């Protein structure tokens, strides 16, 4: 994921998060923020300095905590009001109490703090629904059917096979496959590494290089209607 915060580098959006929830989200990264002159001592009901915080987020470097990058990226993806109902359903299913005056972004922050995997998995499912260009492969025997019930639910063996393949191609392991069933189709979201990169970067005032392995997400679609 690129080190970009887009909307969360805007102080007006940061202010939409309740100070208590924002402080809880930032607490694990207190030292990183304090080293850059940002104080979390206020917290509670008192407003944080969102202008200073936005300034820090707008200039990430290699010392920026990856957990903070991931958290803000996921929360931002669910900050619009159109996501409130699905966030509410997830919160209630998790046994969380939701107040009458809960805002969408506050609920997203609370859910992430409660169980980050809930929002991360939901975001992967949404990626499955995006329109893409596919290469199509039809059944060798069009008369044969596709037995959906015979498809495995446990994708761990598939992930292990993919790990061996990607590792042999110098793309690293730790692949992740997420299955999503829909009307007349089944989608598999495949997340895996790519070849490593080294790019020029800045560490404070010093010129340096950042070495990292990019991530790629592929979608495999099983079309039950057209058998391809």
Which role does the model predict for each range below?
Residues 220-224:
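Broad, structure-driven detector of short, well-ordered beta-strand segments within folded domains
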Residues 227-228:
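Long, well-ordered mid-to-C-terminal structural blocks that present hydrophobic/aromatic surfaces
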